[in-house]
From Swiss-Prot:
Gene3D superfamilies documented for this protein: Glutamine Phosphoribosylpyrophosphate, subunit 1, domain 1
Name assigned to this protein: ATP-dependent protease subunit HslV
Upper classification of the organism: Bacteria, Pseudomonadati, Pseudomonadota, Alphaproteobacteria, Hyphomicrobiales
Enzyme class (EC, first level): hydrolase
Organism: Nitrobacter winogradskyi (strain ATCC 25391 / DSM 10237 / CIP 104748 / NCIMB 11846 / Nb-255)
Protein EC: 3.4.25.2
Assembly and oligomerization: A double ring-shaped homohexamer of HslV is capped on each side by a ring-shaped HslU homohexamer. The assembly of the HslU/HslV complex is dependent on binding of ATP.
InterPro entries: ATP-dep_Prtase_HsIV_su, Ntn_hydrolases_N, Proteasome_sua/b, Proteasome_suB-type
Binding of Na(+), residues: 166, 169, 172
Length: 184
């Protein structure tokens, strides 16, 4: 008899679009374990710091909240410097024994920059102002890139692209949380 492996938590889709003086991050609300939807209205996108940074996460929820707290601490150390705060968090994430075990990715943005942060220490800025993470991330990214040159605004692109991702990815739903900031 074989010991069964614990079911793994799946899914989410987080997307950011920077266009027309706005930056928007949106995410779906589905949390699944194995083939079962555990929750359909999770809030994976929120404002950080003093409300001048927005972020979304994919991965283990408790891990992501730990990382959000650490990022907020770095933002207090380096106010108005999202890139510096993100790099400092990434250094800690790679070198701290506890943080290294955290399984999450984050998209964060302020008025000037959008970044993706990974547990391998990557801090990446998208070339086109569009970036996505999570199980439906590639679908949302492709849809957003297809729409970026249209007359649609950033929030409409995020909503449309996440709807398309929800049509394709079984770990993504249409219960969206959207946050936006004025961008430079």
């Amino acid at each position: 008899m074989q010991a069964s492996q614990p079911e793994t938590w799946h899914g989410t889709t987080i997307l950011t679009v920077r266009k027309g003086g706005k930056v928007v991050i949106g995410g779906d609300g589905q949390v699944s374990i194995g083939q079962t939807v555990i929750k359909s209205n999770a809030k994976k996108v929120r404002k950080l710091g003093k409300g001048d940074v927005i972020g979304g996460f994919a991965g283990a929820t408790a891990d992501a909240f730990t990382l959000f707290e650490r990022l907020e601490s770095k933002l207090e150390q380096y106010p108005g410097q999202l890139t510096r705060a993100a790099v400092e968090l990434a250094k800690d994430w790679r070198t701290d024994r506890y943080l290294r075990r955290l399984e999450a990715m984050m998209l964060v943005a302020d008025k000037d920059v959008s970044l993706v942060l990974t547990g391998t220490g990557d801090v990446l800025e998208p070339e086109s102002g569009v970036m996505a993470i999570g199980s439906g991330g590639n679908y949302a990214l492709a849809a957003a890139r297809a729409l970026i040159d249209s007359d649609k605004d950033a929030e409409t692109i995020v909503r449309s692209a996440l709807d398309i991702a929800a049509d394709i990815c079984v770990y993504t739903n249409r219960n969206l949380t959207i946050e936006a900031l004025a961008a430079s």
